[in-house]
A protein has these predicted regions:
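Hydrophobic transmembrane alpha-helical segments in integral membrane proteins
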Residues: 1-16, 71-81
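Charged interaction patches that mediate protein-protein contacts
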Residues: 2, 358-365, 461
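Serine/threonine-rich low-complexity intrinsically disordered regions
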Residues: 2, 26, 37, 138, ...
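Basic/polar, acidic-poor N-terminal "presequence/leader" segments
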Residues: 17-21
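Membrane-embedded and juxtamembrane structural elements of multi-pass membrane proteins
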Residues: 22-53, 60-127, 134-362
Length: 480
């Protein structure tokens, strides 16, 4: 994909994301005066799109091209994971001023923006654009490092799933259905007001000290209450808080954040980012529930938070949270400040991620070009033809070269120090007017030609019977 096309696509996606964020916000604001339409989505994006797209991509490339194609796809995905890790690290650095400047809803949405990269999974392969940065990783080391990463990823993913299921089983093992008719009537009324189509059972469990919702899908969700009495006003605040999580699909957002943490398990910043993101999800619901609330309601809500200090585990959402975040939430509840909506910021983040996705490269260690081009040939390749080419508007103009020294040309090409690009941006895209040197070698007794193109620090090679297609290499320096 050319840089121009990528830039335009990023602009469109950024604008659509900002508009979608504002649209979802307006939909959610309707809850102040009316009910949501049944099934209405108010989250920025379905959190599980990226994990599903990655799984489908792996299956497709495995079936289409076998283990070799899957390996190339995995190498390209590594760069995508690296970008997500960098994004979360940068977001952590600016999180404190962002929380003071923009709404908690925008801060929560920023953690979900990498999910928009799901459609780029299919176009990260063999991108022709020039790389913004090149990461050097010898190909001999990639396979063992990938194996270590894969073991860590799968191990952490399984551990998270098992931990969640064990916690869910612990919560529901001794839970009993709620029997209070007035409470259930109030709960069902709030379900209808929030546009939730399916009934979500309410249970009481001795294992919890704070109200929470467990389950990633409506059919598996349960609202779990501790065994204590609540007034009607307290129940309204509790139900509104938990239903905001439900209509925003926050339990699946936590599943997505856990998936991203597993992808970047070697990066400690991603573990910190996961905790900060969970805090922002709670702050965002506090903000939504208490919008336009009077001081008495805010005080009642703050008392509920203080009475229910607990830490959420697994893929759950809970009214209160860990002690280290409670002080910050109480400050926001009792002293609300005017903040920007943050829609433009969310759109700008989507633009930046899309514009830079696929612009990194993984390259092999530097070595002489002859090792890649000529070694292993049973016969000495002979130059068949040489052209000098350049792009002018929509045409490629070529001029054949005569009278060259074949031995000197071959020695020059073989002495170039190159780094083979085996993942990410290939650098084949050339600006208009760039001149290229095209050399075709024929191998006696063998079909096919070795086709080389040297231009602007990039050497591309199409080797017969290689099976990898056109190979792009970065030229570090000329030979002696």
């Amino acid at each position: 994909m050319s840089f121009g096309l990528r830039f335009v696509m990023a602009l469109i996606l950024g604008a659509l994301t900002a508009d979608m964020f504002s649209l979802r916000g307006r939909e959610e604001d309707k809850l102040r005066i009316e009910s949501l339409k049944p099934g209405r989505q108010v989250c920025l994006i379905e959190p599980m799109l990226l994990p599903v797209a990655l799984a489908m991509g792996m299956v497709f490339f495995l079936l289409w091209g076998g283990v070799q194609a899957l390996g190339r796809f995995a190498a390209n995905l590594w760069l995508l994971f690296f970008q997500i890790g960098v994004y979360y690290a940068l977001l952590l650095l600016v999180l404190a001023p962002l929380r003071r400047a923009v709404s908690a809803r925008a801060c929560a949405a920023l953690w979900l923006v990498p999910g928009l990269l799901y459609f780029l999974v299919w176009i990260v392969m063999d991108d022709d654009s020039r790389p913004l940065a090149v990461l050097t990783l010898p190909k001999d080391l990639f396979e063992p490092m990938f194996a270590v990463w894969l073991l860590g990823f799968l191990g952490l993913l399984v551990w998270q799933m098992v931990s969640h299921l064990q916690f869910r089983r612990l919560l529901l093992r001794d839970a009993v259905p709620e029997r209070d008719e007035a409470l259930l009537e109030q709960w069902h009324a709030e379900l209808r007001r929030h546009g939730v189509r399916r009934d979500i059972p309410v249970v009481v469990s001795r294992q919890v000290s704070t109200p929470l919702t467990v389950g990633c899908f409506l059919r598996t969700m349960r609202l779990v209450l501790p065994g204590r009495h609540y007034s009607r006003e307290e129940l309204e605040l509790i139900f509104c808080h938990e239903l905001r999580h439900i209509v925003r699909r926050d339990t699946r957002t936590k599943l997505f954040l856990g998936f991203c943490t597993a992808l970047c398990w070697f990066n400690p910043l991603c573990w910190i980012a996961r905790r900060r993101a969970s805090d922002d999800l709670e702050l965002s619901c506090d903000e939504a529930v208490l919008e336009d609330a009077d001081e008495a309601t805010r005080r009642r809500y703050a008392e509920l938070l203080l009475q229910h200090g607990a830490s959420g585990r697994g893929y759950t959402t809970c009214l209160s949270g860990a002690a280290q975040t409670l002080r910050y939430r109480l400050s926001h509840v009792m002293k609300p400040a005017k903040r920007l909506s943050g829609g433009l910021l969310v759109g700008a983040a989507a633009f930046a991620l899309t514009a830079t996705a696929g612009t990194l490269s993984l390259a092999d260690a530097a070595g002489p070009a002859r090792e890649l081009l000529f070694e292993g040939q049973t016969q000495t390749p002979c130059v068949q033809r040489v052209f000098v080419s350049s792009w002018r508007e929509d045409m490629r103009l070529s001029r054949k070269v005569f009278g060259f020294d074949e031995a000197a040309l071959t020695e020059f090409l073989g002495s170039l120090r190159i780094r083979e690009i085996y993942a990410g941006a290939q650098g084949r895209e050339l600006p208009f007017g760039t001149r290229c040197l095209d050399i075709d070698y024929e191998i006696p007794g063998q079909e096919g030609l070795i086709r080389l193109t040297l231009s602007d620090g990039v050497l591309t090679a199409d080797l017969p019977d290689d099976g990898r297609g056109e190979i792009a290499c970065l030229v570090e320096e000329e030979g002696p």
